[in-house]
Amino acid sequence: MYHGMNPSNGDGFLEQQLQQQQPQSPQRLLAVILWFQLALCFGPAQLTGGFDDLNVCADPGVPENGFRTPSGGVFFESSVTRFHCQDGFRLKGSTKRLCMKHFNGTLGWVPSDKPVCIQEDCRIPQIEDAEIRNKTYRHGEKLVIDCHEGFKIRYPDLYNLVSLCRDDGTWDNLPICQGCLRPLASSNGYVNISEFQTSFPVGTVIAYRCFPGFKLEGSENLECLHNLIWSSSPPRCLALEVCPLPPMVSHGDFICHPRPCERYNHGTVVEFYCDPGYSLTSDYKYITCQYGEWFPSYQVYCIKSEQTWPSTHETLLTTWKIVAFTATSVLLVLLLVILARMFQTKFKAHFPPRGPPRSSSSDPDFVVVDGVPVMLPTYDEAVNGSSSALGPGYPASVGQGCPLPVDDQSPPAYPGSGDTDTGPGESETCDSTSGSSEMLQSLYSPPMCQGGSRPAPDTPDTISSTAGEVASTSPGIDIADEIPLMEEDP
């Protein structure tokens, strides 16, 4: 029975050594059984001498970065053990060891050197915020990495900007990808970054905030610059004075913003309100804590409200009052306009327009009708019914008679003599002026007599006598000299 591995694994040297020692005596087997029984009773420490007498090989050990099979037990003569290395390492020397007797009769391992696991290749380093280009690195090769955007490569040795793979599988002067280091934060404030992040790429902006009751002193925002330093020093949060309890209000209370009101720090706003049935005496109901004092500093009071809603009857009465007042105002304005108009009319009647009176003798007004000058009546004549329409010295014609000059009028010597005295020229003049006389008689009523009676209508005798007294147009009045009718062309 062997406490080890069976050496039949194809190793010629070990198989040859074992074949020479194949016969085993029964006495040796009994000795091993006896030794185990004594070890259970007295312990292995008291049987050291006996263990040496049994001729077993010492424990070969386990190489660093490796392991062996079997991992434990007692190794007697002809026992075999195997050694293995972890990934990335290789075993230096033989992987098998044989327990065999030397020439002096003692047992030992063949080969006798201790197994060693050496690193075959340099492992890929774990560099934060970097990408490794190659996957395997042999002895003497350089490490090639790319840092993430915003980070820069930094070497421990500033004079040796390269990292090489050593013989033992380790790296020399291993670099890192570095950004701006995490800045300090105030104990009374906070920043908008993760507590596990230690390096920040270029362009990162960190915002500082203070807890309520503290004021920020310094720059509020910090930026990571290209030289991997922050734009300014971290700010501080300084404690502010806390305002006292707001003034209490009878029949009311207050609420604060922001809530809850654990401390009345700088910037806290208090809003007052009254209980139902009460109202504030002032329209302004807010006060603000500013550097330990309330602003504005005034006392707030709540008084009982006495407001009553008007009834329907009172509302209608108020509406009618408004309508009546509006209608009365409109009527009064209209009455004033009418009175002003009447006063203006009477004023014009009593006070005629100013100006010098017209003189009919000095500056007569004439109208020429069919070549005959006709005097226009004055205002008084038109009102009183006067019909003196001819110019001075020309009496009004009656019926179909023609006007005659005053100087030339003479009663006929004999009745009916007007027919014989009238010349042909005078008859034509009478015919031409008869139309204008009829028009004037239609415009003006006949004048009243001095006694108040109308003149008697013209009789045929009168008409015939008047017709005979037709004035000649050639002598008497020079019409062209008195009134220019039309400017003739030369």
From Swiss-Prot:
Q: Which SMART domains match?
A: CCP
Q: Which residues are in the Sushi domain?
A: 55-119, 120-179, 178-239, 241-304
Which organs or tissues contain this protein? High expression in brain and eye, with weaker expression in spinal cord and testis. Detected in white matter of brain and in the outer segments of photoreceptors.
Q: Which Pfam families match?
A: Sushi
Region described as Disordered: spans on this chain: 1-20, 394-490
CDD domains the record matches: CCP
Q: Where are the transmembrane segments?
A: 320-340
Instruction: Show the GO cellular component annotation of the record.
Output: parallel fiber to Purkinje cell synapse; postsynaptic membrane
Which gene specifies this protein's sequence?
Susd4
Main location, first listed in the record: membrane
Carbohydrate-modified residues are: N104, N134, N192
Q: What superkingdom heads the lineage?
A: Eukaryota
Q: What is the lineage of its organism?
A: Eukaryota, Metazoa, Chordata, Craniata, Vertebrata
Any one of the GO BP annotations: regulation of postsynaptic neurotransmitter receptor internalization
Indicate, by first and last residue, each region the UniProt record lists as having compositional bias (Acidic residues): 479-490
Looking up SUPFAM superfamilies in the UniProt record yields: Complement control module/SCR domain
* Miscellaneous comment as given in the Swiss-Prot or TrEMBL entry: In contrast some authors report that SUSD4 acts as an activator of the alternative complement pathway, while having no effect on the classical pathway (in vitro). These contradictory results with human may lie in the differences in protein expression, in this study SUSD4 is expressed in bacteria and not in eukaryotic cells.
- Name the source organism: Mus musculus
Stretches assigned to the Cytoplasmic side: 341-490
Does the record bear Cytoplasm in its keywords? no
What's this chain's function? Acts as a complement inhibitor by disrupting the formation of the classical C3 convertase. Isoform 3 inhibits the classical complement pathway, while membrane-bound isoform 1 inhibits deposition of C3b via both the classical and alternative complement pathways.
Compartments it resides in = Membrane
Q: Which residues form the signal peptide?
A: 1-41
Q: For bias kind Polar residues, which ranges apply?
A: 430-444, 461-475
- Extracellular membrane side: 42-319
Designated name of the protein? Sushi domain-containing protein 4
Q: What membrane topology is given?
A: Single-pass type I membrane protein
Membrane in keyword set: yes
Which InterPro entries does this UniProt record tie to the protein? Answer: SUSD4, Sushi/SCR/CCP_sf, Sushi_SCR_CCP_dom
